[in-house]
């Protein structure tokens, strides 16, 4: 199966395709997805919140479980989560959205947050879900969540198949250095970096109130790029020497050649966050990895149909790939 997405004529350009999908396109045709929340204790005495889509009718015990790992500053309320909720409901699949630390609306307890290469977090979450669920498990990561998921798949090798039936990354920055510099440059810096920092800085300051002296607040508030923010906050809190070390060691791209479970890596070539030149090529990945690289779609955009459009096509294509390969 190959999905060759083409943006509708009325939705030109990567930036427009990105912003429109997140803010204006229809996410679902029926009722807004409802979620039931579980709180899990973590191995390091912290917590994460996992949202389960509320089922309209009972599902069989062996129904597939669709696990969605969200992107930077995402949640179960993100446009892609609600679009996938509709698609998986129609297929009779369960759906869970495990939130990364601090992303569920409540600050976490430990002196840490989340990061792009957090494959250890992915590992224990998926292990717990495997213990609870007897049917197939399909794991999908969006943007940051997809990089972390593919890092996990690369680290696990053959053992990943004992946990999941397939993995998918959607618009994930598998080369974090290339993507980080792209977001911090020009129009991207003015739009996207500013948008992310507007929520990331207050959250970091909440962490400083919990743990005085954790970082320099003046340096953090002066950060006007993701590089500077990661250098002050993300990298040191998670065991990296600095941003360069973090972006290098956390990138999933070098590990794609070690993936031994059915995997799909989907990236639009006009994604404003991810330079097309940094995308993986077939000779850089294992035989288990399928690459979809449509020319359009933006960053987790992929709206389709007549104006005003909807977000059905990408979740359908990803789910269909899962049924054929997972």
What kind of region is each of these model predictions?
Residues 112-132:
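Alpha/beta-hydrolase active-site loop
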Residues 259, 265-267, 271:
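Short beta-strand/loop motif that positions the catalytic acidic residue
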Residues 133-237:
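Alpha/beta-hydrolase-fold enzymes
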Residues 269-290, 294:
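Conserved loop-alpha-helix segment in the C-terminal half of the alpha/beta-hydrolase fold
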Residues 14-59, 303-305, 309:
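N-terminal cap/lid segment of alpha/beta-hydrolase-fold proteins
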Residues 232-255:
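Active-site nucleophile elbow and catalytic-triad environment of alpha/beta-hydrolase enzymes
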Residues 53-109, 124, 128, 276:
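Short, surface-exposed "cap/lid" segments of acyl-processing enzymes
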């Amino acid at each position: 199966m190959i999905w060759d997405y083409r943006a509708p004529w009325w939705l030109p350009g990567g930036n427009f395709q990105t912003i429109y999908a997140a803010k204006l396109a229809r996410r679902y045709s029926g009722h807004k997805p409802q979620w039931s929340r579980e709180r899990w204790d973590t191995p390091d005495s912290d917590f994460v919140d996992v949202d389960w889509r509320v089922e309209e009718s009972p599902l069989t015990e062996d129904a597939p479980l669709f696990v969605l790992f969200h992107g930077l500053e995402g949640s179960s309320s993100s446009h892609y989560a609600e679009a996938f909720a509709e698609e998986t409901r129609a297929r009779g699949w369960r759906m869970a959205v495990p939130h990364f630390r601090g992303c569920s609306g409540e600050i976490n307890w430990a002196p840490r947050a989340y990061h792009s290469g957090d494959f250890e977090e992915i590992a224990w979450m998926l292990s717990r879900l495997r213990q609870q669920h007897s049917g197939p498990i399909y794991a999908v990561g969006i943007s940051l969540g997809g990089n972390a998921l593919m890092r996990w798949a690369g680290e696990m090798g053959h053992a990943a198949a004992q946990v999941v039936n397939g993995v998918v990354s959607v618009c994930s920055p598998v080369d974090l250095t290339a993507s980080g510099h792209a977001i911090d440059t020009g129009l991207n810096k003015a739009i996207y970096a500013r948008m992310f920092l507007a929520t990331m800085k207050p959250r970091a300051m909440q962490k400083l109130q919990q743990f005085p002296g954790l970082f320099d607040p003046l340096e953090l508030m002066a950060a006007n790029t993701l590089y500077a923010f990661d250098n002050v906050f993300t990298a040191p809190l998670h065991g990296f020497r600095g941003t360069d070390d973090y972006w290098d060691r956390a990138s999933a791209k070098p590990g794609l050649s070690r993936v031994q479970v059915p995997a799909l890596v989907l990236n639009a070539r006009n994604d404003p966050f991810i330079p097309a030149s940094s995308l993986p090529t077939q000779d850089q990945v294992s035989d288990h990895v399928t690459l979809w690289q449509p020319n359009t779609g933006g960053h987790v955009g992929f709206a389709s149909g007549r104006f005003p459009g909807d977000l059905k096509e990408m979740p359908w294509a990803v789910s269909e790939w899962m049924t054929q390969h997972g």
